[in-house]
Curated annotation (Swiss-Prot):
The keyword Mitochondrion applies. Signal peptide: none annotated. Keywords: Membrane, Mitochondrion, Mitochondrion inner membrane, Protein transport, Translocation, Transport. Residues 53-107 are annotated as: J-like. It is a peripheral membrane protein. This is Mitochondrial import inner membrane translocase subunit TIM16. The gene is PAM16. Heterodimer with PAM18. Component of the PAM complex, at least composed of mtHsp70, MGE1, TIM44, PAM16, PAM17 and PAM18. InterPro entries: J_dom_sf, Tim16. GO terms for cellular component: PAM complex, Tim23 associated import motor; TIM23 mitochondrial import inner membrane translocase complex. The keyword NADP does not apply. It is found in: Mitochondrion inner membrane. Belongs to the TIM16/PAM16 family. It comes from Candida albicans (strain SC5314 / ATCC MYA-2876) (Yeast). Pfam families: Pam16.
Length: 121
């Protein structure tokens, strides 16, 4: 009787684990395919940060997002947070990565706009 119960528990656990594994694999494959469809993957490696966070760091609104504004805010915040002013390298790196992320986003948006313009001609 105990053997039958133990075997039943093992088979039930294995089937639950198998279903969870296949569902996780399906979700990962779907996310991978969506990421490869053109939009750059979320910037999460090598210091990259999400666009929304980068805009908060540089205190920018979506409506005022331009390369000039990004560089202006970057210069100001980078200099204010310099080690010579008694501030931290950590804050400077956050400001730098925010600027880098927004520059990449602006390049991507410009590329999309150019492709749409070329497609409509």
């Amino acid at each position: 009787m105990a053997h039958r119960l133990l075997v039943n528990v093992i088979f039930t656990g294995a089937s639950v684990f198998g279903r969870a594994f296949t569902e996780a694999y399906r979700q990962a494959a779907k996310a991978s395919a969506a990421g490869a469809a053109g939009r750059p993957a979320k910037a999460s490696s090598a210091g990259g940060i999400p666009v929304e966070e980068a805009m908060k760091i540089l205190d920018l609104e979506k409506s005022e997002l331009s390369l000039d504004k990004v560089e202006e805010k970057y210069e100001y915040l980078f200099n204010v947070n310099s080690k010579e002013q008694g501030n931290s390298f950590y804050l400077q790196s956050k400001v730098y990565y925010a600027m880098d992320t927004l520059k990449k986003e602006l390049e991507y948006l410009e590329k999309l706009q150019n492709e749409k313009g070329a497609a409509s001609n």
